[in-house]
Amino acid sequence: MGGGNLHSLPPENASVSASYAVTVGNTKLSDAPVLFFVYCHKAFRAQLVELRRFATDAAEADSFSGDLAVELSRKFEFLKLVYKYHSAAEDEVIFLALDKRVKNIVSNYSLEHAGTDDLFTSIFHWLHVLEEEIGSRSDVLREVILCIGTIQSSICQHMLKEERQVFPLLIEKFSFREQASLVWQFICSVPVMVLEDFLPWMISHLSHEEKIEVENCIKDVAPNEDSLQQVISSWLLDDSQSSCGTPTEIMKGVQYVNVSKSLKKSPESHPSSGCFQRFWEWSKKSLSIPNVGRSPIHGLRLFQNAIEKDLRDIQEGLCQAKFQTLILDLDVLMARLNFLADVLVSYSNAFKKFFHPVLEEMTARRSSTAKQFNIDDCLENFQRLLYKSADDKTKTDNFLLQLQEELESLIIQVTKQFAIQRTEVFPIISKNCNHEMQKQLLYTSIHVLPLGLLKCVILWFSAHLSEEESQSILHFLSLEDSSPKKSFPRLLLQWLRFGYSGKTSVERFWKQLDVMFKVRCSCQKEHTEEASGSFSNQTQLQLCKVSKDVYPRKKDKSSTCFMSMDLAVGDMYETPYSSRMNQQMTFSGKLKPPLHLPDFFGEKNMDDPMIMDVKPIDLLFFFHKAMKMDLDYLVCGSTRLAADFRFLAEFQQRFHMIKFLYQIHSDAEDEIAFPALEAKGQLKNISHSFSIDHELETKHFDKVSFILNEMSELNMLVSTINTTAADHDRKMKYERLCLSLREICKSMHKLLSEHIQHEETELWGLFRNCFSIEEQEKIIGCMLGRISGEILQDMIPWLMESLTSDEQLAAMSLWRQATRKTMFVEWLTEWYNGHVLQEEAGEANNDPFGDSDPLEIVWKYLFEASADGEKGSMRSSLLKLPKTNFTGIMNQPPPNYKVEVGKKEEKDLERSESKKICRGSNQEGDKEQTDKMSQKVSQFGPSKKYEQLLTMSEEELVVVIKKISCDSSLDPQKKDYIKQNLLMSRWNISQRTYNLEPSSLSSNMETVHGQHPSYRDPHSLIFGCNHYKRNCKLLAPCCDKLFTCIRCHDEEADHSVDRKQITKMMCMKCLLIQPIGANCSNTSCKSSMGKYFCKICKLYDDERKIYHCPYCNLCRVGKGLGIDYFHCMKCNACMSRTLVEHVCREKCLEDNCPICHEYIFTSSSPVKALPCGHLMHSTCFQEYTCSHYTCPVCSKSLGDMQVYFKMLDALLAEEKMPDEYSNKTQVILCNDCGRKGNAPYHWLYHKCTTCGSYNSRLL
């Protein structure tokens, strides 16, 4: 109901599900551990397909209820969670490592990660509407399915791009050990509660063979520590029940605890895993268990004391760090601060997820203490300041003072929070929860920490415990039996014992932390200095170097990567974690520094290009604005099509224009703008991601074209069939096509909008800052030089329609500036004036009959087609004409304009007969009069038959107009049209008679010189001349003569004709002189004057491929700009696309040939471009090079003359100079390299000592 199956789309080149296998080649996971993330991609794809099928099946079965909406919402919650951790791992682990080796690759992918939150927000909104049963359920279901499709297309395209570009580079640039360390760092950076659900969920979507590969991969990348390996195996191999839920349970929907209805009103307190539900259910059962020993919640007091003590120690250390003697300890202090910030963030999360809802339940929401737990704002500000510590330059006295102030503020907030918890929270929990429930609460809270951070916390915490306190914690962990698996508690117990044993001192612990955070800082600094051109990249290799350089591993890559004998259990290098990854998850990217947008934006709106100094490259982003508006049009138009199929033709026409213009823009960026940007040294690879976007987005356009074609065919069928069962089926198919179209248009809107936004964010400033004004003009000129005049006639109005008046002025100013050395303004003026006149004429005419002759319409209505029942009855009463067929009149041969004209008595006779017919007199002779009139009409032609309208009196006109008004066969628009043209018929006939006067006079002499056909091939009777094949002649206004073409005129006359002044032509079939046009205006002729017609150049041709260049403002022979030619804006010349790389010389065509002195710009002869940049005719070049090898203008060599120069060397070697000249030298200037030098004396040949050329002259 309302959902329906989406219509089948055109087949792809390769299935998306198998794309990962194609993009990364035949590499196996056992050879490249980093492909673990590609297997995650496969799980995401499978999950999205499953969710889409779930929604569509429920919609088709009309079984979509509020409960199903809740279930689907929970599935998407889990998908959002694991995808965000996956994205954070790529941003903060994979991408940073890759950017260390290959610059400018990953920044765009990080931007794409940031755009996924909006996708999930939209689907959650519509699922909530569906759950609350707001509005029409069918409409909401459609929106849900559309949102799922948008999420699917966006995420899948992003993953496909990564598989095509990022992962092949990771495999190429990183060794097996380095890849393994990156995968393990990701696993150690994910909270345990998420990891326990994520790994079983992931492998549940893989085949049996792939599942085994993933299991072996994770075991290989993990350290060879028995307890840790057992934990990993328990997460992977048990597919019946994990500690935090099975994959099956997850996909059925993670059931949050139904503690009270109030929890639903506080979604921020909901965990994203099933741990919370099982904790609560277990804790309810454990209330009856008696309390034994000390309260487990006392351990949190110890934990808080350790945090406060370390914060105070660091505060004292910072006070001493401003002295130069202790500045070396600052790095260790900063590492300790980063670690404690991570601990506080995890501690705060645990309270929000577990302690907060428990406390609210116990106090029946009467306590306000729960709301005082949040110190996120303070932590966020503090961690943002810690980011500045990555650059050593910021560690000045001012920075230290600011850090001390923030730390003091943090200590105050933390102390207050801990005090509230000790006095209000812990007593309530101790009073209302038995020891077993407290143990479960603490144990479950541990799962909030990532595995790597958890180990660091246990080692750090154990160093702060006394012997009695340590024994208490050890006893707590040894008695832990709430979990169905014992491996994880045993691992925690092992880590705690190691820390308590003292094998890892506090000093060593802090040094190891210092190494982890110091590597990050140095990488960030190096990246800032070396790759400042990329906005959002920050690089690090946290573990790769450390693990490779410090700790040896087995050489066999298929074996375990770590050797337990070489690594102590307590070393943190075993379990590295990325604190940035969890910070990104916790604070949703708020800690990241803002993108390095171009300086010209300042504090103003970056969407408004008029706030800045406009530069040539901004023309691209004016185009972006127009494209974004058209994307909105596609979304709105696809929605409208479901209700109005008549809108299909307009939508299809607009879509094809958008597709065509987008393809032109994308090709220009890929082939011109992006290569120019990457040619800058430090910006290599920065645009490849956008080129992949262009390729993939083309497929979306093709899908829309495919659907629109099917809708067009279906629309014709629907419109011609009555309401039947077949018609109903077609209607349902049309609705499904509309839904598919809406989905793709929404996906395109999302993908292209983000693509454009990322281009502007990442590349706009680079184009503006890295290129000078001249270089930007060259880039824009190269892009515009590929666009033909016909496309510009569509593009310019389309672009101007989307811009404000100020933006229009700016855009056209940039356009004119980039083309200032060409004739573009002249072409624009001529085209625009004609375009406006044509539009005004069209608006004024508003012809409901199309382009038909208005007099012909009136004539046919009054005097012809009497076989028509309704119209014939009216005409019989008006004109008393019998039912005579005049349909063959317009097909008669062209009349002979030299006879039957000028005979006054016959004209008078015809007029009198017409009057009698119109007045209805002499009814008995109607047939004879009609036959006689038809004969006269066939002799006089169309222009004379209309003169019968001149004989109608005013009374007759009134009668005719009343009858027209009563004619039910005409719609109101046609009635007004016929009445208006009937009233204007006298003026129209007089004007037409005046225009035809020169060709209508009867004379044995030609009225206009040349008013006769001319033939290109007299034997085959092919019209034209030696220059062109065409069916018309041009009337030269300068001498009032007809010539076949302008070149014929210039050859015969002693002057040149101005093509702009030519306004009339003569059709060589009917010899009618008429205004310039593509076809003959004679209604009995209407012949085409030529396959090619240029209104600007007044050029007709019927055999060659010709195009009008808007920058030359001339017609050129060729297929067109962007096909086989382009226009160089500096040279102001159309050149073959093979000459993209050439020597530019300003307006080189606007000169005479140096040999024959003909003006090259308007010459029709082929032109040869010389290496020096000068031009000459090809025929002149062939003749000239028979005796010369230097340019006649600049004297440079016309080519590679090394063979000739070697011949001269051999010739001079055989010559013997007289003794008096043997030691003499001459000063020469080389014409090729332009350098001066000394050459041995010779009467003719002088060799340049620099380049070896003999093309030189004496000074």
From Swiss-Prot:
Binding-site residues, Zn(2+) 4: 1094, 1097, 1108, 1115
Keyword flag Membrane: yes
GO molecular function, one term: ligase activity
GO biological process, any: iron import into cell
Pathway: Protein modification; protein ubiquitination
Residue sites binding Zn(2+) 5 per the record: 1109, 1112, 1127, 1134
Keyword Transcription included in the entry's annotation: no
Cellular localisation: Membrane; Nucleus
Superkingdom field: Eukaryota
Span list, region Disordered: 904-938
CHY-type zinc-finger residues: 1018-1087
Binding site residues for Zn(2+) 1: 1025, 1027, 1045, 1048
Segments forming CTCHY-type zinc fingers: 1089-1152
Functional summary from the UniProt entry: Probable E3 ubiquitin-protein ligase that may regulate the response to iron deficiency and thus contributes to iron homeostasis.
Subunit structure: Binds zinc and iron ions.
Protein's UniProt name: Zinc finger protein BRUTUS-like At1g74770
Record organism: Arabidopsis thaliana
Lineage, opening ranks: Eukaryota, Viridiplantae, Streptophyta, Embryophyta, Tracheophyta
